[in-house]
Amino acid sequence: MTSFAHRCGIHDDARAAALSRAALLAGGLELVRFAWCDVHGVTRGKTLVAGAAAKAMMDGVGMVSTLMLKDTSDRTAFKVFEPGGTADLPGFGQANNLLLLADPDSFRQLPWTPASGWVQCQPWFQDGTPVELDTRRVLQRALARLAAAGYGMKCGLEVEFHIYRIDDTRAQMDPSLAAWPGLPPAVSLLHPGYNLLTEAWYDLAEEPLRIVQHTAQALGLPLLSLEIELGPSQVEAVFEATDAMTAADNMVLFRNAVRQALRRAGYHATFMCRPPFPNIMSSGWHLHQSLVDARTGANAFRRDAPAPGTSAADAGHTLSDAGEHYLAGLLAHARAMAVFCTPTVNGFGRFRPNALAPQSVLWGRDNRGAMLRVVGECADAATRIENRIGEPAANPYLYLASQIHAGLDGIERGLRAPAATDAPYGDADVRLPTSLGEALQALQGDSTLVDAFGSAFIQYFTRIKQSELSRYELAEDKDDFQRREYFSRF
């Protein structure tokens, strides 16, 4: 009998070889987690006993389709049981089943739980057609468009987050206090903060940071450093640059893994931008990006010598023509792409003056107050653009796809960047959105990004985010809303 993977047209010699490698790695395992990344960047899925996992690698794992329609509280944002409730979403009516098919190349043994494997999946309709609303497919399409233009993408990740010591879970686990969403655990600080990169605070935090290190390295993630950030209990993980899809996959796995591994040891890790406490510092996800020539692998942003007639304030002094066009595209679509970089109500509280976070649509040369920071000099093979508007709770596939579509528009139209800023918190012609609602409106008003992502995806995405926003606007206690909505879930 033909397997579901064959019917989907994805089972070739390469996948068969990857399955063989996964089978070798799976020896001695008892359980395998089949995981999928939802629109919010949260992993969901099913855990199968080892005896059932081999068949599931070929025939898929059933998943209720409403998992793709959830807002950040896990409420379904579409009326799937009402006539016309999913008219714009063919194949999603009546909470029907989708099938998850695994990528055997992603198979790993989990280091924090005994005899358990993990494999990454993507959803398919039961007739063997791909679910195009899947966010990993959104990035795959963006990368295909980039490849057609002759480029690949390389990304390095700098991820700030918070680790707390768990003091009490009684309220969180008290059945009489269960709610939708519920209370997070009671926590205390890991380090007092306000002493950036100090070794003494690192020593205070070493036990959980060693767990982060061992977990990341056991999973094969290209971790470079773990650092003490400025805020209380705030840390940062820095990763070596990889191709774009690998970087996005790594971000999904890293967040998922460290939260679980730390929880077992009595710590609470959160990638919520602004945890629900006074005197915190916001966390950002700084995305370093460059394009590479698809034929040679050379950095397409590198310029061997400054363009004639340019000064240090000009993009062409450091960036190639393609690099300047890409930079200009990011600036042109900054307001529209902001919701993919900062997709939560909570994250927009980060955009404030003199906080090492941007407020305006500007670029700077090695300027950490600017939205876009150009890093490198002429003839530097590591020349790149750092986007500083992302929050660590962002869906990695959508974050990276937004960069590709915005940057490619700049290349295709030959856009030129304005002069670099040396006053990122001064007056500016264009400001970043200051709320989720404003960011959604900016996205809907940008026909270039709507066309690039596809109007069906934009309608789907905005409907789900609007559900989150509407509940926030109705909440009497806005702080309690964010505490319950984000602190445990991200």
Tell where the protein language model's regions lie, with residue ranges:
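Short beta-strand elements
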Residues: 174-187, 285-295, 361-363, 370-376
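Secondary-structure boundary elements
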Residues: 144-154, 214-222, 247, 254-270, ...
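ATP/Mg2+-dependent ligation/transfer catalytic cores
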Residues: 1-225, 247, 431-490
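C-terminal accessory/tail domains of diverse enzymes
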Residues: 2-27, 35-42, 246-247, 257-271, ...
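Short, contiguous, pocket-lining structural segments
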Residues: 200-208, 225-231, 243-254, 277, ...
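Glycine-rich, often proline-containing surface loops adjacent to acidic residues and nearby aromatics
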Residues: 115-123, 232-240, 283-288, 382-384
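Core alpha/beta catalytic barrel or barrel-like domain that forms the active/cofactor pocket
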Residues: 154-162, 180-199, 219-238, 269-286, ...
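Hydrophobic/aromatic-rich core segments of domains that either
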Residues: 272, 286-305
